[in-house]
């Protein structure tokens, strides 16, 4: 389902299996106001030591660009916090070309305070778009990275004696 949304967003003429047709039609309707600027690009966030590929960079009707992540599971609310953190990392990253080890900034119009969760539950024939608070998401991601780093440290060794 995810690969079909990408093909649709890139303007490819594809044959969608009948099982996915209601989902793709719902996706097209829900995302009609969004203009896809980039899809499935690799990014790196050196500060958080994180990397990955975002689903979409989209332009809103007001001209702002925001990161969007597509989820096909049953319950979008179940993973809203983790998705906000994930999308916030992408929005605060640099485009990264692995072959040349080159980092490129996103366009200035990228809004790093808000993102979108595009919820397309597989087999339901419905699609809903939810706003994500990326300021909160980045705070969450930063805290998670700090915990990850703390877990890597070696604890101070304390001498202990049962008689002390």
PLM features: residue spans?
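Metal-dependent nuclease catalytic cores that hydrolyze phosphodiester bonds in DNA/RNA
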Residues: 1-51
């Amino acid at each position: 389902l995810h690969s079909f949304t990408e093909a649709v967003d890139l303007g490819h003429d594809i044959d969608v299996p009948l099982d996915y047709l209601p989902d793709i039609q719902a996706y097209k309707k829900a995302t009609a106001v969004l203009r896809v600027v980039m899809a499935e690009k690799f990014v790196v966030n050196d500060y958080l030591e994180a990397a990955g590929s975002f689903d979409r960079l989209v332009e809103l009707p007001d001209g702002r660009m925001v990161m969007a992540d597509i989820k096909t599971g049953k319950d979008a609310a179940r993973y809203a916090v983790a998705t906000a953190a994930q999308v916030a990392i992408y929005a605060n990253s640099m485009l990264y070309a692995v072959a040349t080890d080159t980092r490129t900034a996103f366009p200035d119009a990228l809004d790093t305070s808000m993102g979108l969760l595009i919820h397309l539950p597989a087999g339901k024939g419905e699609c809903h778009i939810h706003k994500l608070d990326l300021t909160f998401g980045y705070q969450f991601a930063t805290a998670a990275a700090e915990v990850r780093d703390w877990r890597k440290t070696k604890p101070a060794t304390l001498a202990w004696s049962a008689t002390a």
